[in-house]
């Protein structure tokens, strides 16, 4: 067994210094988490807990709030699933193929990270409005995107897209092509090769990317408020409803609705993390 007394004074000084550095690192980490994450969430929960149970339930289950939850969660889920499919395709192309403009396309994937969400919303509204480049053509087909629920999903697609691609790329880069070639040589079809050889190692990363995309879409405000009509019971989402409550100085309503969205998001993320852990155990 290791005995600190067996060390000379110089070694004990080094060991003591390392322990202090570790302690300081832990203290700084906890302080950062406390200030940036735990305190704001705690303040929100504390503010909403000041309401009585009946008042909390009344505000949280108001028809306009229930509609906003439904629009937010359903639109975010559809956007995340679509990004899961097309994000996988784009990540596959970027990793497995060389073509002119590949680096430019790879850099463009990160554009939603750098672009202000208000600029993204303005761009989408300009392009998909009735007088926009694409909106004009869609209008001839009686399809309206801007200032509708489709606009909400489009904005969520835009801001959450990079999460899936960037989560899948490292996994695809680490996968050996020899596994695919071996499956093909044994007579497996491309579909069976994907389903039995590629899908198992990709599934945890895919679910992580979809979860991150969903979380990002649920919290989106800047682009949605511009590209949607923000009409209750139609395309009003929870973050915009919270802001409307703040504009009306209804702080109780804003905190209660914010708490509900927070709890829903945390519950879904915990469920997804549990599924990921189960998949890892199943895959060994």
Swiss-Prot record:
- Kindly report the protein's main subcellular placement as a broad class: plastid
Q: Does the keyword Plastid apply?
A: yes
Q: What superkingdom heads the lineage?
A: Eukaryota
> Which species does the entry assign this protein to?
Nephroselmis olivacea
Name of the protein in question: Probable sulfate transport system permease protein cysT
Gene this protein is translated from: cysT
Instruction: Outline the extent of the ABC transmembrane type-1 domain.
Output: 69-272
Family of this protein:
Belongs to the binding-protein-dependent transport system permease family. CysTW subfamily.
Reported function: Part of the ABC transporter complex cysAWTP (TC 3.A.1.6.1) involved in sulfate/thiosulfate import. Probably responsible for the translocation of the substrate across the membrane.
Question: According to its UniProt record, where is this protein located?
Answer: Plastid, Chloroplast membrane
């Amino acid at each position: 067994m290791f005995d600190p007394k067996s060390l000379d004074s110089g070694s004990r000084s080094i060991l003591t210094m390392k322990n202090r550095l570790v302690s300081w690192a832990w203290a700084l980490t906890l302080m950062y988490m406390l200030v940036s994450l735990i305190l704001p969430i705690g303040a929100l929960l504390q503010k909403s807990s000041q309401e009585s149970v009946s008042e909390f339930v009344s505000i949280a289950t108001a028809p306009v709030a229930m509609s906003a939850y439904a629009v937010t969660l359903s639109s975010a889920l559809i956007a995340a699933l679509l990004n899961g499919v097309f994000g996988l395709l784009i990540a596959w192309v970027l990793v497995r193929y060389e073509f002119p403009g590949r680096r430019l396309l790879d850099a463009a994937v990160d554009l939603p990270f750098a672009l202000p969400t208000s600029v993204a919303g303005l761009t989408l509204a300009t392009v998909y409005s009735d007088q926009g480049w694409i909106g004009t053509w869609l209008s001839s087909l009686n399809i309206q995107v801007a200032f509708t629920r489709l606009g909400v999903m489009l904005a969520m697609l835009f801001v959450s897209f990079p999460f899936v691609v960037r989560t899948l790329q490292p996994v695809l880069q680490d996968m050996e092509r020899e596994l695919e070639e071996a499956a093909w040589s044994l007579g497996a079809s491309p579909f069976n090769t994907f389903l039995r050889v590629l899908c198992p190692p990709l599934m945890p990363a895919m679910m992580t990317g979809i979860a991150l995309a969903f979380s990002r879409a649920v919290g989106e405000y800047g682009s949605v408020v511009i590209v949607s009509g923000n009409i209750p019971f139609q395309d009003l989402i929870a973050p915009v409803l919270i802001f409307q409550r703040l504009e009306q100085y209804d702080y109780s309503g804003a905190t209660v609705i914010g708490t509900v969205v927070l709890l829903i998001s945390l519950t879904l993320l915990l469920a997804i993390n549990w599924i990921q852990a189960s998949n890892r155990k199943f895959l060994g």
